Amino acid sequence: SDIAIAVAVEDGLFTPVIRDAEAKSLSKLSKEMKELAEKARSKKLMPNEYQGGSFSISNLGMFGIDNFDAVINPPHGAILAVGAGLKKPIVNEDNTIAVSNVMSLTLSVDHRVIDGALGAELMQNITKYLEDPVLMMA
């Protein structure tokens, strides 16, 4: 899958695309994402580096935004909105209360392209991997 990452620039927004993301390691994805974001900010992206893509990720959490709904940018079929990680009280399985880091994720899908149930499965998997990052190393 080709994944677009929203990058704020001085005059607006670019969505550079990481090609064949599913075939890359987490460290390779991170490196490529940083390189593309820097190219976007320095206005050195080539058209083939921001055109296309099927899925977008927008992280306003880095600006302290807790929760938001992102708008799908065609031709993408879905976009994941990532909110800030905040310390919040949670109830553990043994009914004790603890402070934990919690973040919000909101997935918007174009139902002409992606069935809502498939979107829900995607959210389950994203949540599973974020709650237990060691699974991403396998």
What is the meaning of each model-derived region?
Residues 1-138:
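C-terminal catalytic/motor cores of large multi-domain enzyme assemblies
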